[in-house]
């Protein structure tokens, strides 16, 4: 951790060096004599006081030999830092500054108080308080060590040059301060040795960023005011005209400007945290700055227009530019090589250098202006009237009029009537060919065939009836039953169902579908239109009903009579009543009745019923029952005769006549338009010829050279300079005077 080092005062002996004598050229050899004597004296004093061992083996002018102040730690709570600093100041005030024993006292104090680590606060407010406290300590110590010192004896800072010239105001103020101090404390001046004070460069007041910004803004305002004045003068000269002589501005005497260090503008670091000063050889660093640039010969002044304030509203010429579609822009961007890949030509570099040839020469030859009107807007897509008329002409030329042949009846003069249509014969009625009549005829022919005479023909008797029994089925040989022991001992014996319990399954009667009657037309049953009532989908009503039923059931159970306890009578133990013993009958052998035999008989029976039903339906379908004939009683169909009026002759207009009139009007209009165009072209040609003649006359007038008179200017008055000659002073290369 870095330790906080307070500023210290230097106890110098009574015999001090006069720095004004160092400016003499003859004393340059013994410049370092005073510093060597000073270092030897300090080593002697420290050796006597017992601290000489600390400084052995070190050069006398090292910074390590300098005295270190007492370290006080920083604490965030309470103002302990300020209290410790005040105690330190009191201790320093009690000890005289010129006493050599002060080193011993401070060494003893530093031994007693152990070095504590510094606690650095990162807050800006704490840093500002620290800076103010340090400034206050520096001022207090500067007052204590203030002695009657001549200003010429103050050591120069590292950045300032040693110069004999000083402002009279500063000298006067310095003399006043020294005289006042000498008058107020004559006794102190006698007792104390004269000590060189701190140089003024170290007592700089640090400015805040706000003050620096204000200074910058003030400077900028002053520059703007000066520029305005110059512009006004230049404007007056320009308005006065070219013929008047231009007044040259008289060069003023150089004004002395105070030093302005750029380091003051930077944000300063804490003085305790700055890096140690590195010693640099002054002679090696000399003449490293760049050489002064050669003066460039200025050419003639080129008159430039005033950059006055103008409106920011864009005009039509500025806004409108060549229209390039977005697709074309994208394609150009991908095809274009970036500028950074293009090689620069040497001509561009040559043009950058200032030269007399770069001044533009005003040409006297007339030149046509390079107008950019064709690039202002996008190309016009709509066609002009001239183009439209040309297209119409082409269409008219392409269209060929073809006249129809003349009808000779028009010239005859008689009325042209339409041809009469041919007379159609009257409708002949045709009788209806009904299907019923055909069926009646077919039925009569069938009846005649049925009435034919029946003759009996005997058939031969089958021999099988005589040989064997026919129609009785053979008796099936049943298998012998195998006896099995009855399973009485089994607990989980499955009892076979008795025949009484078994319900006889009725055989499923398969009904054949009726044969459709193809004579009757099919009429589908139209479903009845029912309006569906929209009900809300909810379970609330159902839940409520269920809850009501539940409550009703609970009430009924509650209303029911409470069962009364009735004790059973005691049994009679005298007689033992046992159930009668049931004697089971012996199993009798019965023939087996298989389900397969029963199923086959049922199937044969159902098949027989189906055949009978089909035959009956076929017979019913064969019998046709005709509907009564109502056509005979109705009136026959008679077509109605149309009652058309006689055709009346109407006036008519031929399309050829109409087209001929329109054609004549069009030709007349076309001839008028052509005549107007020819007249306009003739007028335009005449105007153009007149303009050319006027332009030639104007150019001839302008080309006649008129020489300007020779201008007369005031003679130059050469004035001798009032400034004194520069006195050469040898430079002070030694860095020892820089504190």
Swiss-Prot record:
Disordered: region residues: 110-143, 156-219, 347-374, 411-431, 658-694
Biased composition, Pro residues: where in the chain?
418-428
Main localisation: nucleus
Q: Report the residues modified as N6-acetyllysine.
A: 128, 304, 374
User: At which residues is the cross-link Glycyl lysine isopeptide (Lys-Gly) (interchain with G-Cter in SUMO2) found?
Assistant: 476, 640, 732
PTM sites of type Phosphothreonine: 59, 72, 147, 337, 368, 498
GO molecular function terms noted in the UniProt entry: importin-alpha family protein binding
Query: A Gene Ontology CC term for this entry?
Result: microtubule
Biological process terms from the Gene Ontology for this record are: apoptotic process; cell division; mitotic spindle assembly; regulation of mitotic spindle organization
UniProt keywords, alphabetically: Acetylation, Apoptosis, Cell cycle, Cell division, Cytoplasm, Cytoskeleton, Isopeptide bond, Microtubule, Mitosis, Nucleus, Phosphoprotein, Ubl conjugation
Q: Where is the composition biased (Basic and acidic residues)?
A: 126-137, 166-180, 207-218
Looking up Pfam families in the UniProt record yields: Aurora-A_bind, TPX2, TPX2_importin
Q: Localized where?
A: Nucleus; Cytoplasm, Cytoskeleton, Spindle; Cytoplasm, Cytoskeleton, Spindle pole
> Which residues, renumbered to this chain, carry the PTM Phosphoserine?
121, 125, 256, 291-292, 309, 358, 485, 730
Q: Which domain of life is it from?
A: Eukaryota
Q: Which InterPro entries match?
A: Aurora-A-bd, TPX2_C, TPX2_central_dom, TPX2_fam
PANTHER family per record: TARGETING PROTEIN FOR XKLP2 (PTHR14326:SF44)
Subunit composition? Interacts with AURKA. Interacts with importin-alpha; leading to inactivate TPX2. Interacts with HNRNPU; this interaction recruits HNRNPU to spindle microtubules (MTs). Interacts with BCL2L10. Interacts with KIF11.
Role this protein plays: Spindle assembly factor required for normal assembly of mitotic spindles. Required for normal assembly of microtubules during apoptosis. Required for chromatin and/or kinetochore dependent microtubule nucleation. Mediates AURKA localization to spindle microtubules. Activates AURKA by promoting its autophosphorylation at 'Thr-288' and protects this residue against dephosphorylation. TPX2 is inactivated upon binding to importin-alpha.
User: Would you identify the family this protein belongs to, as annotated?
Assistant: Belongs to the TPX2 family.
- What name does this protein carry? Targeting protein for Xklp2
Task: Supply the source organism for this entry.
Answer: Pongo abelii (Sumatran orangutan)
Q: What is the lineage of its organism?
A: Eukaryota, Metazoa, Chordata, Craniata, Vertebrata
